[in-house]
Amino acid sequence: MSLAVNPADNLAALIRCASVTPAEGGALTALEAMLKPMGFSVERPVFHDEDTPDIENLYARKSGNGPHLMFAGHTDVVPPGNEGDWKHPPFSAAIEDGVMYGRGAVDMKGGVACFVAAVARHIEKHGSIKGSVSFLITGDEEGPAINGTVKLLDWAKQRGESWDASIVGEPSNPNALGDAIKIGRRGSLSGTITVHGVQGHAAYPHLAENPVRGITTLVDSLLYPAFDQGTANFQASNLEVTSIDVGNKATNVIANKATASFNIRFNDTWTAETLQAEIIARLEKAARDNRLRPGRETPIKYELTWREHPSHVFLTRDEKLIGTLTDSVEAVTGKRPELSTSGGTSDARFIKDYCPVVEFGLVGQTMHMVDERVALADLEGLTQIYERFIADFFG
């Protein structure tokens, strides 16, 4: 049986599986069919949690004597939206002018397809690998991320698995293949502020207490001054207000409650705990120093709730992993990639607790968009980078 050496063929097989979270959609079955002929053992545990859908995952390993490299990623995708808006059907893997179209083409079935092809090519050329390679693939990255990578890592550890390094195949490049390797991620912390007032007629504000006055005051205290100016490896921490709501459609009524939600992406100046303390201190001062109605003695009354499980900031410093991948990228693309910590969170935030981890994949410009697509030349380029990395990593 021929091995899965062609990344475009691999990707087409994966795209044709409509694996919108939480559906497996046949994607893990297609991946298993690529891995087993190469001698991988494959297991597909299903994880459960209260009030969340069951999620099927895949863990595959090909064992050898030497270091253990994990490739991590996901085969689930976001919904395509209105399929009529697509140039080609989102699960058709249509090719036009050297470009493959389909949901998940870059995020991140393309990365999976390329790493499979890279391993297959290495085995065809060398017969074996001087170490162990595993695939840790979830179907829950685009969803709640509760029954996916975080549980799959623990499941594997309980079975005696350990890893020396990991690559996550997320689309790390902003504009062109070889732009950037992600060597860390900012932390993420979310919360909701609720201010309680007294409902009343807009024409008689002295009889009411407007919570909008309070919520804007508290929000303003979180926006200014800036939390920091950035660090050597990370950009400045940034808080965004994601919603403000009073649940009031009447224009002549002062609402009795207002809420504001926020998210902050933070750098290594902070831990989640120290940042929470800073936010609480700012809110306490703003609430103490201001009133819902001029002349009132009572400070602003508010509640603060945190979203569970904040993501912690991390930075990978493993010289072998970063250096080998950087050299591989340069050898194929001719340029030295930036070592970046920008962007949002990924499942690397879970893997960092088990082994050094970096992210490198395709160009992310069309991820989650209508007409998500990837150039076939980029698929070949990424496969060559991965193949060179595998050869050099295992020596």
UniProtKB/Swiss-Prot annotation:
Alphabetical UniProt keywords: Amino-acid biosynthesis, Cobalt, Diaminopimelate biosynthesis, Hydrolase, Lysine biosynthesis, Metal-binding, Zinc
Superkingdom: Bacteria
Residues binding Zn(2+) 1: H74, D107, E170
Pathway as given in its UniProt record: Amino-acid biosynthesis; L-lysine biosynthesis via DAP pathway; LL-2,6-diaminopimelate from (S)-tetrahydrodipicolinate (succinylase route): step 3/3
Xref: CDD domains: M20_DapE_proteobac
Molecular function per GO: acetylornithine deacetylase activity; cobalt ion binding; succinyl-diaminopimelate desuccinylase activity; zinc ion binding
Residues that coordinate or bind Zn(2+) 2: D107, E142, H368
E.C. numbers: 3.5.1.18
One matching Pfam family: Peptidase_M20
EC class name: hydrolase
Catalyzed reactions per annotation: N-succinyl-(2S,6S)-2,6-diaminopimelate + H2O = (2S,6S)-2,6-diaminopimelate + succinate
Disulfide pairings: none
Cofactor note (record): Binds 2 Zn(2+) or Co(2+) ions per subunit.
Reported cofactor(s): Zn(2+); Co(2+)
Active site, per annotation: D76, E141 (proton acceptor)
Record keyword Oxidoreductase present: no
GO aspect biological process, one term: lysine biosynthetic process via diaminopimelate
Family: Belongs to the peptidase M20A family. DapE subfamily.
Biological function: Catalyzes the hydrolysis of N-succinyl-L,L-diaminopimelic acid (SDAP), forming succinate and LL-2,6-diaminopimelate (DAP), an intermediate involved in the bacterial biosynthesis of lysine and meso-diaminopimelic acid, an essential component of bacterial cell walls.
Subunit structure: Homodimer.
Descriptive protein name: Succinyl-diaminopimelate desuccinylase
Originating organism: Brucella anthropi (strain ATCC 49188 / DSM 6882 / CCUG 24695 / JCM 21032 / LMG 3331 / NBRC 15819 / NCTC 12168 / Alc 37) (Ochrobactrum anthropi)
Gene expressing this chain: dapE
